[in-house]
Regions:
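Hydrophobic/aromatic-enriched cytosolic interaction surfaces used to assemble or bind macromolecules
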Residues: 1-190
Length: 190
């Protein structure tokens, strides 16, 4: 049995059924090496992407603060963008890469608004992927895009049976896999 599709399609399938995906939604999937962006409005209407991901954030912090990669990763996932004593330095380190993602997201949104016939007003931004595991990233996107944004959390809507859910800090990584697991059996090729 086989199913091949772009990862953003699997993400969209999951979010459409669990995260108010019936609303016109911007999906920002921040993977380790790249970010995929999609507009979901009944189906995927527009996509975009760039070669900046969670690993880029870690490298940015390590370079800017002159610390080892392991320490940079810890600062990223523990402190991130939320208020605190170290945040100014972290925000300054992360800002250039985050700004590139914001600009590409705005470009995709603008294309949807200007070129897609019958489009509806975009209602929300859902951030997924391992790179979404940064405290304060939802608020950062909300402020930058002037639209409600948050890290997607579809887990409460999924039936794991006897399997244990992934640990909270790893959940954003499994969004694509969970979306693939939601493929109706009739769509699979034997």
């Amino acid at each position: 049995v086989c199913m091949i599709e772009p990862s953003i399609s699997a993400v969209a399938r999951l979010l459409e059924s669990t995260e108010k995906g019936h609303l016109p939604t911007v999906i920002v999937d921040i993977g380790p090496a790249s970010t995929d962006i999609a507009i979901l409005d009944g189906s995927i209407r527009v996509t975009g992407g760039l070669s900046i991901g969670g690993n880029t954030f870690t490298l940015d912090i390590a370079k800017k603060l002159h610390i080892p990669l392991e320490n940079a990763h810890q600062l990223k996932v523990i402190n991130g963008l939320s208020p605190g004593s170290r945040q100014q330095k972290l925000v300054k380190a992360l800002s250039p890469s985050l700004e590139h993602i914001i600009k590409e997201t705005q470009k995709v949104m603008r294309y949807y608004d200007e070129r897609v016939d019958g489009h509806r007003k975009l209602e929300q931004v859902l951030i997924v992927g391992g790179g979404a595991n940064i405290p304060g990233i939802g608020e950062h996107f909300t402020n930058a895009l002037v639209m409600p944004a948050r890290v997607a959390s579809p887990w409460q809507h999924l039936n794991f049976g006897t399997l244990q859910q992934p640990a909270k800090q790893f959940r954003p990584r499994y969004i694509t896999v969970a979306g693939l697991a939601c493929v109706p059996p009739k769509e699979l090729v034997a």
